[in-house]
Regions:
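Flexible, low-complexity junctional segments that flank or bridge functional domains
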Residues: 1-215
Length: 215
């Protein structure tokens, strides 16, 4: 065996004396995710009152504090994260700001599986309108890599064009702002998360500044 005898005995003792009883408060779902059975549910209001927002923060923080195995490997001290987000949750002025703060909190885990699924963010903050092309982020440059649907292609843009600005905002600045609330375990995973939002727009029209053939 590759495990030393004393370590093996300790691990075996833990296994033999494990708690097999169902908890009143927590159980595993069929796929292994945690289920918190007796947490009181509140209104489905998209923008709850301040006390409920702070309760939500406390619940989220406690789940990570006691059940997230990588807590001590996070980029930031989890206790300091709590102190940082108490005023952000308390002072959120509207539903959009609140949902964005929740997403920012989840980004502290640097795990794309912890993203917030929010129609508020999709519709009011980032927008549901997207252009008919995909981009790749290569060496701080945003390059059109694919036309999504040929029949909707108006031929104004083509693969290889470099996107410099969107709606007069440098795309790199927009990326950096999004990177504050969307984090991944590594740069490629971050780009996969951010790219769909990078060119999202609340209007069905946008202006682009591009570089083509060096011009």
């Amino acid at each position: 065996s590759y495990i030393k005898k004393n370590i093996y005995e300790k691990l075996n003792n833990i296994f033999e004396n494990r708690n097999n009883k169902n908890s009143k408060f927590i159980n595993n779902s069929r796929i292994g995710n945690l289920k918190f059975n007796n947490e009181k549910k509140y209104s489905e209001n998209e923008f709850p009152q301040q006390s409920i927002r702070l309760l939500g923060l406390a619940r989220y923080w406690n789940i990570i504090n006691y059940f997230f195995v990588y807590k001590n490997d996070l980029e930031e001290n989890w206790d300091k994260v709590l102190l940082e987000f108490i005023p952000k949750f308390a002072n959120s002025s509207d539903v959009s700001e609140y949902h964005l703060v929740v997403q920012e909190l989840s980004s502290k885990l640097y795990d794309c599986h912890s993203m917030v699924r929010s129609d508020i963010l999709d519709e009011k903050v980032f927008g549901r309108f997207t252009p008919n092309f995909r981009i790749e982020y290569i060496d701080t440059t945003f390059i059109i890599s694919k036309i999504r649907t040929e029949k909707y292609d108006d031929k104004q843009l083509k693969v290889g064009d470099i996107i410099l600005k969107m709606n007069n905002e440098p795309l790199k600045e927009r990326y950096d702002e999004l990177n504050k609330v969307f984090k991944g375990a590594n740069p490629p995973s971050e780009r996969r998360i951010i790219n769909p939002y990078l060119l999202s727009n609340t209007d069905n029209q946008m202006s682009l500044v591009i570089l083509r053939d060096g011009v």
